[in-house]
Amino acid sequence: MRLDKFLKTNRIIKRRTVAQEVAKAGLVKKDGRILKPSYEVKPGDILEVSYGRRTLKILVTDDMKYQILEERFRGDEDEESN
């Protein structure tokens, strides 16, 4: 399944056009490499998706759903150091 469709179908991002824009902006990575919207997502892939203030690290499951491995919010690091 294409990356943009995967993000939309699993409601990680609400609209496919927004998912395409996020990918084109370099905000979706696998193993530190930026992915294109046309990347074919496979079970076992670990993706890092940055959207808004949120960054998700997700594992793609066998049924093409996902499991959240880590969730961070931009700005949280600043508050913790105070």
Place the predicted regions along the sequence by residue:
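Loop/turn elements at beta-strand to alpha-helix junctions within RNA-recognition modules
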Residues: 12-13
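Strongly charged
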Residues: 2-5, 17-82
